Amino acid sequence: HDHRSGFNSTILKGTLRNILYKIDGEDPESKYRLEYGECKEGSERVIVQDNVVFKETCRFDNIEGTSYYMDHDVLHKIELMTPSVITHMVRDELVKQAPNFIIDTSKPFKCAFSEPKTDKECWEIIEYTINLSN
């Protein structure tokens, strides 16, 4: 996915890996599709390109106390390198209304924001994460 705006992110706890990608053409055998649209339950996304081929351009780890900047149009995914990660994200102004997603058409797509948590659940997760290594 990419983002609606660029952002700075500081790792407050844990280690986070960013893997960056670029679209590298298309192949009729590819099961991947580039879609544009909101990430919420019931929203429809627009197919930008079918049968996309994408390739990893780089990866980097950010440890606790470090920061990185991600531009709005950078396709990336994150991996948690520690059991928990807490970040502080500061977004730039919106550049576009919705992000792009690389979708694996052989699997159902589930957006992380499609089932929002209650405030109580969020605070329980935060408390658990903070206390995980204490």
Language model regions located:
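Short acidic/polar capping segments at secondary-structure boundaries
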Residues: 73-76, 93-95
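Short acidic-glycine-tyrosine-enriched beta hairpin
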Residues: 22-72
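Non-heme Fe(II)/2-oxoglutarate
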Residues: 92-134
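A short hydrophobic beta-strand segment most commonly corresponding to one strand
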Residues: 8, 83-99
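Mixed-charge (acidic/basic) macromolecular-recognition segments
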Residues: 82-83, 106
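Short beta-strand His + acidic residue motifs that chelate non-heme Fe in jelly-roll/DSBH
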Residues: 18-19, 76-81
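Short, conserved beta-strand element in jelly-roll/cupin
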Residues: 4-18, 22
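Histidine-centered active-site/metal-ligand motif
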Residues: 1-3, 76
